[in-house]
C-alpha cells in the first residue's frame, strides 16, 4: 500500500506526493530566498489613488506576490501530475512549447491519433498577445505529427466542462 493514499488509481500515489513535495517545496524555498524589490512608484501611487496607508499597500503587494508564486506552482503541479499518467509523457522545458503528449503508442480514442497538450491552470493565463503563438505551436505539432492538439484549461471560464475547437 502506498505511503500516501489519495484515492487516485490512475497514477502512482507515492510519485504524486513526491511531485507535490518537489513543486511546492521549491516554491517555498524560492519565497524564503532574497525577494525581488517592490516597485516604489507603483506602491506610492496606489496608496495615494486608493487613499490607503502605504504600509497596507506594501503588505498587500507582498501577499499578491506570494499568491502569484503559488498560482504558478499550482499550474506546474497540474502539468506534472498529468504527466504521471502512464498514457501521457511530460515534455518539460524541452517540449517544443507544449507540456504533454500521449505516451508512445497511445492514441486518443476519439481521433485514433496521438495528442499534444498545452496545460493552463486557468482560462485567463494566456496573454492575448501570446495566444497566436500558442495556437501556432499546437497547430504545427498536430499537422507535422499526424496528431491532435489541445489547450487544456484546468479551470475554464465557465462552470461547465467542454471540448470544442479553439
Say what each PLM segment does.
Residues 1-77:
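Interdomain/boundary linker segments immediately adjacent to catalytic/signaling cores
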Residues 22-38, 115-134:
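Generic detector of solvent-exposed, compositionally biased contiguous segments
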Residues 69-95:
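Short N-terminal edge-element motif at the start of the domain
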Residues 92, 107-109, 140-144:
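Short, conserved, surface-exposed binding loops centered on an aromatic residue
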Residues 98-126:
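Conserved catalytic cores of phosphodiester-cleaving nucleases, focusing on short active-site segments
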Residues 121-166:
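Catalytic cores of nucleic-acid endonucleases
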Amino acid at each position: 500500500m502506498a505511503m500516501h493514499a489519495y484515492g487516485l488509481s490512475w497514477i502512482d500515489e507515492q510519485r504524486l506526493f513526491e511531485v507535490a513535495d518537489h513543486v511546492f517545496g521549491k516554491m517555498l524555498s524560492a519565497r524564503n530566498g532574497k525577494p525581488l524589490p517592490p516597485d516604489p512608484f507603483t506602491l506610492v501611487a496606489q496608496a495615494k489613488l486608493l487613499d490607503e496607508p502605504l504600509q497596507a499597500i506594501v503588505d498587500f503587494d507582498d501577499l499578491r506576490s506570494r499568491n502569484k508564486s503559488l498560482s504558478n506552482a499550482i499550474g506546474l503541479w497540474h502539468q506534472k501530475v498529468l504527466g504521471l499518467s502512464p498514457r501521457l509523457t511530460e515534455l518539460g522545458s524541452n517540449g517544443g512549447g507544449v507540456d504533454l503528449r500521449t505516451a508512445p503508442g497511445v492514441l486518443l480514442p476519439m481521433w485514433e491519433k496521438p495528442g499534444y497538450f498545452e496545460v493552463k491552470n486557468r482560462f485567463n493565463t494566456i496573454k492575448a498577445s501570446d495566444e497566436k503563438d500558442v495556437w501556432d505551436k499546437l497547430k504545427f505539432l498536430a499537422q507535422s505529427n499526424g496528431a491532435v492538439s489541445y489547450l487544456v484549461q484546468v479551470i475554464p471560464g465557465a462552470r461547465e466542462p467542454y471540448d470544442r475547437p479553439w
